[in-house]
Amino acid sequence: MSKPVVTRFAPSPTGYLHIGGARTALFNWLYAKHSGGKMLLRIEDTDRERSTDAATAAILDGLTWLGLDWDGDAISQFERAPRHREVAEELVALGKAYYCYATPEELAEMREKAREEGRPPRYDGRWRDRDPSEAPAGVKPVIRIKAPQEGETLVQDAVQGDVRFPNKDLDDFIILRSDGTPTYMHAVVVDDHDMGVTHIIRGDDHLTNAARQTVIYDAMGWDVPQMSHIPLIHGADGAKLSKRHGALGVDAYRAMGYLPAALRNYLVRLGWSHGDDEIMSTEQMIEWFDVKDINKGAARFDFQKLEAINGVYMRASDDKALYDALIAVLPEIEGGKEIADALDDKRSTQLLAAMPGLKDRAKTLVELADSSKFIFAARPLDLDEKAASLLNDEGRAVLKSVLPDLEAAGEWTVESLDGVVRTHAEKTGLKLGKIAQPLRASLTGRATSPGVFDVLFVLGREESLGRIRDQIG
C-alpha cells in the first residue's frame, strides 16, 4: 500500500509572500487535497539576519487570505538545528561525510587556480581521505558530504522528466558549517525526511539543488520524495517577472481589490490547465489538478487576464459577501478610509442596495469602492469634467423639465422610476439617453455610474431630488 501523500510549502521569512510563492503553495495545497493527503508548512528561517517575525506573520496571513490552510503547526527550520547537526555527524560515522580543515586561504587558492584554468571553482577533496589527526591547530572544521565522483545523479521529476547531473560537477559540498549550523542543502533534506514529505513541488530554480539533495538522501539510505520542479512565472513580455510585471506580495493584490477565489483561479492556470476551462471552482481545481499536467515552459503573468477573471467572480458573488469583502479591504485601498469613516447605518444599507449595479461594472474592489462614492458625496456635489459638460444650459433644462415628473412619482422603485422617465421621454420627444446623462451627472457628479434608475433608488427620493435641484440652481 502506498504512503499517504504529504506535500510541504517552505518559504523563507525574509519578505512578503510573493506571487510565485503563492502559486507554489497553491499547487502543493491542491495536490495534497486531490490525493487525500496533507500539506505541511515549514518556515525556513535559518538565515537569522534576514528572517523576521513580521515576514513570517505576513506569509501566514497571505496563505490564510488565499484560503490555503495547512495541516498541523508551522515548523521552524531554525529550531531543528540540533537534529541537522546529529544527521551530519551520523554521516561522518557512516563514512559518507568527513571533517574538512581547509583554511580560508587554501579555499581562496583553489578558487584562484580554477579561475586561471578557466573552470568552475571546486573544492579539491584534500581532506576527503585524510586522517583528522593531521588537522592544523585552531581550525574549526566543516563537514562535507562524500559526493560520488564518477557517473551521474538522476533526478526523476514529474514535470521535467529524467534529469541527469554529472557527478564530477557536484563537488563535496558543505553540509555543516564550522559554527555547527547546517547549510540550506542539508537542512531541507533532513526536514523533508523527518516530516514524512512524499512529494516536493517547488520552482525549477531548485532543480540543480535536487541533485545535491539526492546525494544526501542516498548517503542516509532514505527514500527520495517525488520531485516536481515547476516553471517560473515571467512577465507578459517574456522577461523574468519583476515588480513592474506583477512580482508583488499577496498583500498588494488584496489592496488592489482582487478576490482570493479569483486570484486562486488565475494562479492555478499559470503553468497548468484543464482543457479550455478558464473559470473553475475550488472543488473542480481539487478534482482536476495533477502535477503531471504542469507545463515545462514558463507561464506569463497578465494583469488584464487577472482583472477579467476577477470581474467574473465579482459579478457572480453574493451581494452581502461582496459588501463584506469591500468593508474588509477599505483600510488598505486608496480613498477607502473616507468611505469607512462615513459608513453609518443608512449608508451601509444604501451601499448594500447598490451592490447589484456596482458589481456589474467593476473589475476590482477598488473600482467598486470608487463607483460607490456617489453614496457618500456631500451636497452640492463636485462635478468631474465630463459631468460638468453634461450639465450645460441644455442639460440643466432637461433636469428642470423632468424634475416635476420625478417629484410626482408615487413609488420610489427602480421599475416605477424607469417608467416615469420613459414616459417623460415619449412626452417630450427626447431620447432616453438625453435625459439619463444629465440625471446621472447631477446625482453622482460623474458621467459614468451604475444604471441611473438604480442610483435614484439607492439615494432615495429626498436625496435624489435635492441633488437635482442643486444643479438646476
From Swiss-Prot:
It is an enzyme of class 6 (ligase). A motif ('KMSKS' region) lies at residues 240-244. A motif ('HIGH' region) lies at residues 11-21. The keyword DNA-binding does not apply. Its EC number is 6.1.1.17. The keyword Ribosomal protein does not apply. Residues 114-133 have a biased composition (Basic and acidic residues). Signal peptide: none annotated. InterPro entries: aa-tRNA-synth_I_cd-bd, aa-tRNA-synth_I_codon-bd_sub2, aa-tRNA-synth_I_CS, aa_tRNA-synth_I_cd-bd_sf, Glu-tRNA-ligase_bac/mito, Glu/Gln-tRNA-synth, Glu/Gln-tRNA-synth_Ib_cat-dom, GluQ/Sye. GO terms for cellular component: cytosol. GO terms for biological process: glutamyl-tRNA aminoacylation. One of its GO terms (molecular function) is ATP binding. Pfam families: Anticodon_2 (PF19269), tRNA-synt_1c (PF00749). ATP binds at K243. It is found in: Cytoplasm. Keywords: Aminoacyl-tRNA synthetase, ATP-binding, Cytoplasm, Ligase, Nucleotide-binding, Protein biosynthesis. Residues 114-136 are annotated as: Disordered. Monomer. Catalyzes the attachment of glutamate to tRNA(Glu) in a two-step reaction: glutamate is first activated by ATP to form Glu-AMP and then transferred to the acceptor end of tRNA(Glu). This is Glutamate--tRNA ligase 1. The gene is gltX1.
